[in-house]
Amino acid sequence: MKIRETGTRQQHNLRRARIGCVILKKNVTFTMGIRFSRWLVGCGVAIAFGVLSPSVTWANPQLNALLEQGNEQLTNRNFAQAVQHYRQALTLEANNARIHGALGYALSQLGNYSEAVTAYRRATELEDDNAEFFNALGFNLAQSGDNRSAINAYQRATQLQPNNLAYSLGLATVQFRAGDYDQALVAYRKVLAKDSNNTMALQNSLTSLLQLGRNQEAAVLFPDLLRQRPNDAELRIKAAVTWFGLNDRDQAIAFLEEARRLSTRDSAMQIRVGKIYETQNLLPQAIAAYEQASFVDPQSREAFALYGSAAMKTEDYINAIIAYRALTELSPTDPAAFYNFAVALQGRRRSREALEALEMARDLYQQRGDRRGVNITESLMAAIEEG
């Protein structure tokens, strides 16, 4: 009777774990770090509970006890204790794939990916038709930084279960991380064929296409992504780069301005947009973005330096003076800031102020032992005095 009660309880837990696994597969989320531990938790518990059959107990009472204790610790997320129990169990039953799989799962949850790889690799040797094990092996290999081996493991998982969305997504994401953009696209398209609104598949397909210079194909993916992420400034920047590649400057500018609007209080984002404008020789737009960046973060040396530089390129000396004056206040020991400030002042024929700034620049160059800087500064001073 006791065995039957234990089996019934484990059967309930196993059913619950498997249900959780299915649910988590649908909601799997990835970042560039391939975070799919939420999915792994659900499936790992199912594997771990499968160590001890719901209806059959092992002949060895000591093994039964160790596995029950390991499963209980796993359920309670006491992974270090679970590892101890499973390792002891393996001394009694060394060739059981399920015990190796449970050990691998517990090790993975502790962040010990290299040892988890060893456990899952042994599990796959003992059960070479178990897609769950190959999937878990792929995850831990990827977390260990061995993307090539991870790809092989995921490919085996997808061969065993070609219709499993999570496995295809895992394969695609590791291929993407490894820079295999062509192969990642193939895998992501399989995901999108089953789940056309999968945001991660859409985003990484998009990035893969952009990396491959296939802008026309990338453009097709944007409508769905833009609709799904109406407040994503980063996505608008990618869209802008795509449309610049398609020589549609007006649409690209519209995307960049939308990105700016979505991040008006983000100095770093304003700088990014400004740099894109500058590479496209759209200097008035770049100046506006850099000016906004300096307004949001008045301590940003980078923002003021870029602001001043872009203004000088268009001979917008008033904005250049504003930018470089602020930069000299933020960097009072930077001779280049004073030199550029002087050039901007001279652009407005403010010679006396320009000479004062150049004297400061020369002194700072001398303090640094920068003879070339001193010579350039003195040459400009002489030209102003002669003119």
From Swiss-Prot:
TPR repeat locations:
63-96, 97-130, 132-164, 166-198, 200-232, 233-266, 267-300, 302-334, 336-368
Tell me which UniProt keywords the record has, alphabetically: Repeat, TPR repeat
* Stored Pfam families: TPR_11, TPR_16, TPR_19, TPR_6
Q: Which domain of life, per UniProt?
A: Bacteria
Task: Tell me the PROSITE patterns matching this sequence.
Answer: TPR, TPR_REGION
Q: What is this protein called?
A: TPR repeat-containing protein SYNPCC7002_A0425
Question: Which species expresses this protein natively?
Answer: Picosynechococcus sp. (strain ATCC 27264 / PCC 7002 / PR-6) (Agmenellum quadruplicatum)
Query: Which lineage ranks, top first, belong to the organism behind this chain?
Result: Bacteria, Bacillati, Cyanobacteriota, Cyanophyceae, Oscillatoriophycideae
